[in-house]
């Protein structure tokens, strides 16, 4: 892909990930804290929003590796699949059921406060939610999966942006061959509390996976398959479905609609008694499953609130724009490194958007007042060093 190679574009060498580029664009000083100083936010005992995603990614990865291995399409796989910082890891040939069993054990070792935090956010204990989500995910995409040949899972890639001295690298959740369309696709899996409305245009402008498709091109050449022509997004809702409720008259309560078809059918079972509106009980009865409700819950509109996928073509023009932007940002990063070495700090992007939710905000304010050469204990600002032996100023 042709890129500008003017002398001012050439950097001695800079290696970057998408996350690094994004953070530097937000604020060079925040980038310095993370990538030069090695600072991270202190981990709390429980971070269910983040941790559930890690657990589901592990289940999903082993599911896809198993499929690729069984069908003989798998070209590459990691040695291990990880869950959370405090959770277990698994060999590449483990099964999803191994993760389920480990989740039960992990849950059993959590303290009462940690469990409460999980339940408040997730709506169910981790083992039950993980099992339900995985089962429903397989049911939802089973037919589509028959047309997919898994090539790689958790695949690392790196590639130089031509003529710039910039090397980009990252990890792709999955690379697969779409047998129906005859193309190779890079897929990104995302979990979130609820699934909002995401358009194809939004996903096309998400440069991360577009860049990954570009970065994986040479590996696809080595594997003897075509280079990626599309990117896919596999979105999964984390929060558990609610339990349906009945009114006294035996009607579904309008106040609770946030449940899926499986939850509804399990709740109904052989029927749910209701007391009726009359005091003598003569209007009591048993609620049974309604065909209209089953049809509603099985509709694409409702199902997409729990699981959603989109396929977006790789645009060479879009990729070129993002590569040029990446090279430009890496040029800025090189300047940040020089300034940080000389002055002990970097440029700051002042403003509510950059500072309001920045994990380094408290330390940043302290150093603006006291200067970068003072003594600042990371833990006093809710931070920790990635390297435990690091001694900060």
Map each language-model feature to its residues.
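RecB-family 4Fe-4S metal-dependent nuclease core
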Residues: 1-393
């Amino acid at each position: 892909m042709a890129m500008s190679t003017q002398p001012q574009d050439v950097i001695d060498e800079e290696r970057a990930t998408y996350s690094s580029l994004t953070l530097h664009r937000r604020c060079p000083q925040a980038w310095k804290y993370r990538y030069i100083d090695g600072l991270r936010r202190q981990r709390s005992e429980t971070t269910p929003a983040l941790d559930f995603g890690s657990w589901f990614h592990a289940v999903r990865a082993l599911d896809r590796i198993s499929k690729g291995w069984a069908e003989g399409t798998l070209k590459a796989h990691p040695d291990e699949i990880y869950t959370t910082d405090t959770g277990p890891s698994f060999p590449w040939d483990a099964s999803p059921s191994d993760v389920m069993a480990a989740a039960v054990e992990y849950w059993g070792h959590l303290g009462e406060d940690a469990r409460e935090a999980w339940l408040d956010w997730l709506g169910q204990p981790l083992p039950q939610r993980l099992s339900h989500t995985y089962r429903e995910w397989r049911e939802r995409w089973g037919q589509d999966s028959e047309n997919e040949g898994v090539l790689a899972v958790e695949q690392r890639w790196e590639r130089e942006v031509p003529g710039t001295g910039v090397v980009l690298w990252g990890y792709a959740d999955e690379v697969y061959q779409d047998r129906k369309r005859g193309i190779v696709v890079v897929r990104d899996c995302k979990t979130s509390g609820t699934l909002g409305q995401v358009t194809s245009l939004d996903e096309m402008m998400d440069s991360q996976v577009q860049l990954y498709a570009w970065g994986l091109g040479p590996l696809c050449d080595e594997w003897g398959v075509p280079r990626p022509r599309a990117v896919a997004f596999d979105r999964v809702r984390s929060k558990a479905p609610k339990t349906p409720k009945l009114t006294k008259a035996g009607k579904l309560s309008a106040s609770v609609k946030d449940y899926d078809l499986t939850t509804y059918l399990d709740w109904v079972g052989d029927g749910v008694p209701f007391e009726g509106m009359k005091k003598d009980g003569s209007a009591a009865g048993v609620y049974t499953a309604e065909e209209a409700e089953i049809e509603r819950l099985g509709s694409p509109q409702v199902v997409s609130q729990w699981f959603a996928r989109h396929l977006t073509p790789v645009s060479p023009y879009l990729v070129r724009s993002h590569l040029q932007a990446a090279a430009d940002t890496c040029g800025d990063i090189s300047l940040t490194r020089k300034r940080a070495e000389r002055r002990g700090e970097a440029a700051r992007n002042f403003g509510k958007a950059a500072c309001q939710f920045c994990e380094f905000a408290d330390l940043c304010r302290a150093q603006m007042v006291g200067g970068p050469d003072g003594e600042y204990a990371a833990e006093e600002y809710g931070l920790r060093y990635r390297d435990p032996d690091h001694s900060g100023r």
